[in-house]
Amino acid sequence: MIMGASNAAPVIINCTGETFTPTKSGAISTWVWEICRSAQKQGVEPWVITRTRDAEPYAWPNTILLDYPWIPQMRGTGIGRLLQWQKQITGWGHVRQGAYARAVVQAIRERGLEHGPFVLHNDPEMAVHMRRCFPKSVIVHLFHNANPCSETYRRQFPGAVTVAAGVSDFICRWQENYFGIPAGTTKTIYNGVDLQQFTPSEKTPDGPPVISFLGRTDASKAPDLLLRAARKLARKTKDFSVQILGARFYWGSEPDDYQRLLDQLSSELEHDGISVRRPGVISRSAVPGELRKAQIHVVPSRWDEPFGLATVEGMASGLAVVASRTGGTAEVVGDAGFLFERESEDELAGHLATLLEDKKLRGEYGRLARARAEKFTWDETWSVIRDAIQA
């Protein structure tokens, strides 16, 4: 790894597919915004370089919006196969990735930011490209999830970065194995949560206990598993309801087989006498209030969730948490919640039944979850980032 040190404001470079808006962006966008806010408290104002989008960006003064041709992947078409062929030639995951990298470097040079330090996300190809262009700069690369790349960039990545980091120990171990980085040399930089925004409800909501899901409604996040477990619960008790917060995409849903499956399972659960609320896309500002309507928070992910923001946001809201034992989730939840094996709707239903049957236990695990969440703050995340760029 390249060594270096810097006391300058970092230049945070969004990954190729991400944008920087409070309404039509994902978790990395939230990370960038929260880190900027925490840095500002200490008199540091990072630069943010990101792709533009047809939505109002976060109101951050040092934002550089890049408007470059957005080329779809077009899988299964002749053009799509041609784009895959270029990957074998250039090593870039997609032609738009190379276009974005060139636009980023141009923007950096135009504004005299060549000395960095640079903070990158989920973009090992970009890290290698940046090292070629800025050989003496500090480059911190943070993996938010497992993001493989071509063999060319896989070999070059370890030598391109000053600090190789991940949002959990789980993703750091993946990174070491995948890139051949010596064990224990990657840096864990946990995500955070806004403890002033995500707070427990001051009083128990009226009505039956609400079991909540928050996130994208796709198969990897597995809201269907919650609905299936809820159907099993409904055979024993009708004293609960379910809310599914989110949509297939950050900006809404389009009909597909999985969304139709969720429709079917929701209808069957309502036929069983259980209310199911699915409001669709929830704006970031509305999420804390929506979570406070619930008493139990379920994270049923099938995929290896490295550090889900939805997990820690539910915990900070004082909800009893039940999550699948995948990826880094056990690191986040610790002993402050219930874990179940991937795909086990029976085990999930059992944990939910335990919490529904015992209001006192539900409250106790809600308090444990909040206390655990208080260990993960954005100020602490920024502190670790600051130390990394000054190393």
Question: Model regions: which residues?
Answer:
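Short alpha-helical donor nucleotide-sugar binding micro-motif in glycosyltransferases
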Residues: 281, 289-294
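Short hydrophobic beta-strand element within catalytic cores of glycosyltransferases
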Residues: 320-323
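Nucleotide-activated donor-binding/catalytic signature segment of Leloir-type glycosyltransferases, i.e.
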Residues: 256-285
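A charged, aromatic-enriched C-terminal amphipathic alpha-helix characteristic of glycosyltransferases
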Residues: 95-99, 360-390
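Conserved acidic donor-binding segment of nucleotide-sugar-dependent glycosyltransferases
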Residues: 338-345, 354-360
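Short acidic/histidine- and often glycine-rich active-site loop of Leloir-type glycosyltransferases
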Residues: 326-339
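Carbohydrate-associated surface elements
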Residues: 170, 192
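Conserved donor-binding/catalytic core segment of Leloir-type glycosyltransferases
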Residues: 165, 204-221, 226-231, 242-245
